[in-house]
């Protein structure tokens, strides 16, 4: 496409942080498929929280994915999902962000959808494609996002990915816009006890997302499929 490929964008500081993360990585990250079926839940974020507490990485870098949708006055639709790249990735893992239909999908005549959160759920359900196709059938972006979340909830069957009550023990947030400019952000859990939620800033426990129109930027509360926060007891 004409872009110059950089050989290595690491700094000495970032490389040291990555090496420390790699040193602390739990062997249970590397479960074989046959072992994953019966494995108990592993808190993969524990290492990152410890690295932040130790000052190895700043708290603002806890999450790495950003999604943005847009539509202009002519009705042209666009969407983009960025991620943290190779940082904190399990060797061999393929993220959802670069997979069209998983972490991102756009149809210029219908709308755009993308997400932040557990990428494997998107790869399994092709969630962004599902949302855009739901909007094609006339659903509002909010209802289309809720349908994708319900699909993920029902398809999450591995014990290690479920709370004692059967609900997912991970969060995921969808962002969608249609060609008319109607928009929504909907999370599996729209409340969060952490300083920052999957979607961005929290207002008390309510996660909020950013919106920018001709009237300027503002934040709005996310809707949620499951009441409460991910951290609430099941």
Could you say what each language-model-derived stretch is?
Residues 1-234:
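N-terminal nucleophile
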């Amino acid at each position: 496409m004409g872009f110059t490929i950089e050989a290595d964008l690491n700094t000495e500081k970032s490389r040291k942080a990555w090496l420390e993360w790699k040193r602390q990585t739990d062997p249970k990250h590397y479960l074989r498929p046959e072992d994953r079926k019966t494995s108990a839940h592993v808190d993969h974020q524990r290492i990152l929280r410890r690295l932040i507490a130790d000052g190895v990485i700043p708290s603002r870098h806890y999450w790495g994915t950003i999604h943005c949708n847009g539509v202009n006055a002519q009705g042209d639709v666009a969407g983009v999902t960025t991620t943290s790249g190779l940082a904190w990735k399990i060797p061999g893992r393929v993220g959802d962000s670069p997979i069209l239909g998983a972490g991102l999908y756009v149809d210029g005549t219908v709308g755009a959808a993308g997400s932040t959160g557990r990428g494997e759920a998107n790869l399994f359900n092709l969630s962004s494609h599902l949302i855009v196709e739901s909007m094609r059938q006339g659903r509002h972006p909010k209802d289309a996002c809720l349908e994708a979340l319900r699909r993920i909830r029902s398809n999450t069957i591995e014990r290690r990915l479920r709370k004692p009550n059967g609900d997912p023990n991970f969060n995921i947030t969808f962002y969608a816009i249609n060609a008319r400019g109607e928009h929504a952000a909907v999370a599996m859990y729209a409340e969060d006890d952490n300083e920052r939620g999957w979607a961005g800033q929290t207002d008390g426990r309510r996660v909020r997302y950013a919106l920018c129109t001709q009237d300027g930027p503002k934040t709005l509360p996310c809707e949620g499929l499951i009441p409460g926060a991910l951290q609430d007891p099941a």
